[in-house]
Regions:
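Conserved alpha-helical substructure of the radical SAM core
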Residues: 1-124
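Conserved AdoMet/S-adenosylmethionine-binding subsite of the radical SAM
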Residues: 81-175
C-alpha cells in the first residue's frame, strides 16, 4: 500500500440493520431482497462497526472529509433488530448525528431504554406514514394486528416529540 495516498471519507453513512419487516406494504421494493436475504446480524456486530466508524471522525492530514452522520435504515424495518436501541445509543455516544428511517411501530424501545437527553441529540426519526388517516394507512401497509397500527405509530411519534425528539413524517407519492 502507498502510505502517502489521501483517503476520502464520507460525511454520512447509511446502515441497514435488518431485512426483516413487520409490514407488507403493497409498493415495497425490498420484498425480494428480504425474502432472499433473511439473515440478521447480532447487535454487537453493529456496535463494533460503530467503533470502527468512530475512527473516521478523527481528523488526519492523510484524509479528506470527516464522518458526521449515521442513519439507520434497512431493506426491512431497522427497529426489529433485537437491541437496536443499544446500537442507536452507542452511535449517539460516539458523537455522530444519528437518525433512523422507520415505520414507527417499535419506537417505544428507544423511550424505554435510552436517556431522553441522548435522544434529543438525534438528527431525526423519519417515520414512513403514507397516509394521514387510519383506514387508508392500514390498506397501504397491509398490517395484521389486533390493534390499530396507525394509532400506535401516531402514539409513538407523539411520545418522542413530547421529550424533544425531532420526528419527520415521510410519504411515498405514486399513482
Amino acid at each position: 500500500k502507498n502510505q502517502d495516498t489521501m483517503k476520502v471519507l464520507p460525511a454520512q453513512v447509511d446502515i441497514d440493520l435488518t431485512n426483516v419487516c413487520n409490514q407488507d406494504c403493497y409498493y415495497c421494493n425490498s420484498l425480494d431482497h428480504r425474502t432472499n436475504m433473511p439473515v440478521q446480524k447480532k447487535y454487537t456486530e453493529y456496535i463494533d462497526l460503530i467503533d470502527k466508524l468512530a475512527t473516521w471522525r478523527i481528523h488526519s492530514p492523510k484524509s479528506v472529509g470527516t464522518l458526521h452522520t449515521v442513519t439507520f435504515t434497512g431493506g426491512g424495518e431497522p427497529t426489529l433488530l433485537p437491541n437496536y436501541e443499544r446500537v442507536v445509543e452507542h452511535t449517539i455516544d460516539h458523537g455522530f448525528l444519528t437518525s433512523i428511517t422507520t415505520n414507527g411501530f417499535k419506537l417505544e424501545k428507544l423511550l424505554e431504554n435510552v436517556d431522553y437527553n441522548k435522544l434529543r441529540k438525534m438528527g431525526w426519526i423519519g417515520i414512513d406514514i403514507d397516509a394521514g388517516e387510519e383506514e387508508l394507512y392500514e390498506k397501504i401497509r397491509r398490517t395484521i394486528s389486533k390493534t390499530s397500527t396507525f394509532t400506535k405509530v401516531m402514539e409513538n411519534a407523539r411520545n418522542l416529540v413530547s421529550v424533544g425528539v425531532n420526528v419527520d413524517f415521510k410519504i411515498l407519492l405514486g399513482e
